[in-house]
C-alpha cells in the first residue's frame, strides 16, 4: 500500500494557494515528498481564471475590487471560478505512479474517483459526467467564462448537475489536479465580476449556469460543514487510490519555495498576461 501525505492548510490568499500547489509539485518532482492530497480554502474570496483565459476581456476588475475579492491566474486550464464557500482540493502525484493512466482524461477519472467516493460517504449520489451531444457542443464552444456551466468528461455531478470543477496541469513529470467542491453557490456574485456583451447576455448565461451547477447546501437542504467534507474526501481518496493517507505539514523547503513563488502569482505579468 502506497503512503500519501495529507495536508490541511486552512484558508489562504490567492497567491499563497497557487504558490503552495506549485511548490508541492516541485518538491514531489525532486523526490523530496510523497504524493500529496491538500485540502484548503480561500481568504479573501477569490476569482481564479484558467491559464489560457483572457483576463482583460473576461473579468470586470472594477467589480472585483469593489467587492474586495482576490484574483489569480491558475497554472491549470479551465474557466473562471469564484472561490468562496467551498472546499478546494489539490492532488500532486507522479505521472509514473502505479495505475495512473497516461492520458489527461483517464487520469482525471482515476484521481476524481476519490471525489466520488468521498461525496458518497456524505450521502450524495455522485457519479462521473459523460456529456451527451449537446454537452459536447457546449464544451467545444463554451457559452461563458464561468466554470460549472457544463460538466466535462469525468467531472463529478449529482442529480445531473455539476458539483465539482477540476483542472489539471503536468510539469516535470508530475500531475497537479485541483478543484472546488461547492458548499454553497452564489451565481449573482460570480456573474457580477465577469464581463459580458450586455446585461441581457449576462442574465441568459446566468440562468444556464444555474441549470447546470449545484452546491452541497442545495442538495442537502441545509449547510454542510467544510470539516465534514474534508474528512469524507480524505477517506474517499484513500479508498480510491488504495493508499494510506498520513497527516503531514509542508516542509521547510516547500514553504521557502512557496514564499518565492508568491511573487509570481502576485505579478501583473502573470495574472494579466493574456
UniProtKB/Swiss-Prot annotation:
SUPFAM superfamilies, per database record:
Class II aaRS and biotin synthetases
The cross-references to PROSITE patterns, in alphabetical order and at most eight, read: BPL_LPL_CATALYTIC
Could you tell me what reaction this enzyme catalyses? Answer: octanoyl-[ACP] + L-lysyl-[protein] = N(6)-octanoyl-L-lysyl-[protein] + holo-[ACP] + H(+)
List residues traversing the bilayer. Answer: none
Q: So where's the catalytic machinery, residue-wise?
A: 147 (acyl-thioester intermediate)
Q: Name one GO biological process term.
A: protein modification process
Gene3D superfamilies linked to this entry: Bira Bifunctional Protein, Domain 2
Q: Which domain of life is it from?
A: Bacteria
Domain named BPL/LPL catalytic: which ranges? 31-245
Protein family membership: Belongs to the octanoyltransferase LipM family.
Q: What is this protein called?
A: Octanoyltransferase LipM
The organism encoding this protein is Kyrpidia tusciae (strain DSM 2912 / NBRC 15312 / T2)
Amino acid at each position: 500500500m502506497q503512503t500519501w501525505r495529507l495536508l490541511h492548510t486552512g484558508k489562504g490568499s490567492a497567491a499563497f494557494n497557487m504558490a503552495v500547489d506549485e511548490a508541492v509539485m516541485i518538491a514531489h518532482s525532486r523526490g523530496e515528498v510523497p504524493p500529496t492530497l491538500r485540502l484548503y480554502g480561500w481568504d479573501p474570496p477569490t476569482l481564479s481564471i484558467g491559464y489560457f483565459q483572457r483576463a482583460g476581456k473576461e473579468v470586470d476588475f472594477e467589480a472585483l475590487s469593489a467587492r474586495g475579492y482576490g484574483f489569480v491566474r491558475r497554472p491549470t486550464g479551465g474557466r473562471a471560478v469564484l472561490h468562496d464557500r467551498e472546499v478546494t482540493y489539490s492532488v500532486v502525484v507522479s505521472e509514473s505512479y502505479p495505475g495512473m493512466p497516461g492520458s489527461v482524461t483517464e487520469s482525471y477519472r482515476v484521481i476524481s474517483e476519490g471525489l466520488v467516493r468521498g461525496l458518497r460517504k456524505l450521502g450524495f449520489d455522485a457519479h462521473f459526467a459523460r456529456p451527451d451531444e449537446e454537452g459536447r457542443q457546449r464544451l467545444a464552444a463554451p457559452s461563458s467564462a464561468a466554470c460549472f456551466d457544463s460538466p466535462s468528461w469525468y467531472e463529478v455531478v449529482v442529480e445531473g448537475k455539476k458539483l465539482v470543477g477540476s483542472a489539471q496541469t503536468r510539469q516535470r513529470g508530475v500531475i497537479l489536479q485541483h478543484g472546488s467542491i461547492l458548499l454553497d453557490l452564489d451565481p449573482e456574485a460570480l456573474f457580477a465580476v465577469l464581463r459580458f456583451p450586455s446585461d441581457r447576455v449576462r442574465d441568459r448565461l446566468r440562468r444556464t449556469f444555474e441549470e447546470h451547477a449545484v452546491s452541497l447546501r442545495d442538495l442537502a437542504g441545509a449547510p454542510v460543514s467544510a470539516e465534514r467534507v474534508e474528512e469524507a474526501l480524505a477517506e474517499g481518496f484513500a479508498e480510491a487510490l488504495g493508499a494510506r493517507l498520513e497527516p503531514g505539514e509542508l516542509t521547510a523547503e516547500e514553504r521557502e519555495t512557496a514564499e518565492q513563488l508568491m511573487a509570481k502569482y502576485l505579478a501583473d505579468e502573470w495574472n494579466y498576461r493574456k
